[in-house]
Amino acid sequence: MNGITNRLFSCCSRFARVGAFTLWLAAMFGSCQAYSRELVMATTFSPSATAWIIQRWQTEPGSVMIRTLNRTSGSLEQLLDTANAENVDLILTSSPMLLQHLQEHQKLALLDSAPAASQKLVPRSIRSTSVAVAVSGFGLLINRSALAARHLPPPADWQDMGLPSYQGALLMSSPSRSDTNHLMVESLLQEKGWTAGWATLLAISGNLVTISSRSFGVADKIKSGLGGAGPVINNYAKLLLNDPNLAFTYFPYSAVSPTYVAVLKNSRHADEARAFIHYLLSPKGQRILADANTGKYPVAPLSADNPRAAQQQRLMAQPPLNYRLILKRQQLVQRMFDTAISFRLAQLKDAWRALHSAETRLKRPLPEIRALLTSVPVDAASSEDETWLAQFDNKSFAEQKMMEWQIWFLNNQRLAIHKLEELK
């Protein structure tokens, strides 16, 4: 009897193991099926900036899960230049420079049938592979309490940020670390002109607490009170405005910054990726992008009774940025900013502090010394000379220029300090 019982238990145990294994296989198969339909979207935006859109998409019948890879533009370039590229299907970014790079390296699929309202916002050179689904604008994120503690009014524009009263109160990123910041810097250079634009940036540099590694890092640091104000794109600011200490104000001449979407040529889920883009461009998708939770504006015009319609119209009415020029002088602007500001920030702050102190003591401006601290070693004509700009693709040429600029800035700063000492 015991033998029969043991054999029965043994048989049941084997059936149980087989059943459990079958259930495990079924679960794994189901999981793999779900994973195989997952879209991987690489993006330069922060997770909070994409969460609302993805949540709403995933309530749609037949929608697939979206997993995001949130990285800098430079990091995504490196990732997507590799063979497997982590099986990325989509790119969501405000960086035309990233999309231009990917297109030149044959990484993007062709897209067609985009609405005219979308395509007119896309730089001509990437219109065959990219569509604009939303727009943003540039402005200043303000920490009211941080400024109030220093008895300072909020700055209204780039010019205000260079005032001596804002010493140690400002934050920004750099063009080499953030394409969003690059576009903001270019909007200033194109608005004011090359020479005046750099003079403004160099005056601001004396007031910076630090250079943030990410554009949304500027917003996070201002929220924490590390700085009182800084230039950001509106969608990062809008997501923080439930904090009563924070406010956002657009620059008077804020350029429009589109949000682009593109499909990777080697996407394993190209149909699903295109379905997501069609959803974003559909009336329903545009209504979701009009929601303040995204911090963006749709490309389709908002109705006149929408409280956000007036600002959308103001953004759309601004002259478009010269994207051809931005792409041609990308290396120049990035290297100039780092050489002029990022790599010598501590010395710059000392020099500007000395100048402001001297002007206060003497009760008069010192334009000659100020000119030494606000000049750059490249003239406006060269900044638009495509033949000369193309040489920056040669690493040796670019590094040689940076060495020359370092010496130029150092000599100017030494001369400025010498002249200030003579005034004592």
Language-model segments: residues:
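Periplasmic-binding protein-like
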Residues: 118-122, 136, 170-173, 200-205, 242-269, 279-300
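Short helix-initiation/N-cap motifs at beta->coil->alpha
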Residues: 69-79, 206-220, 256
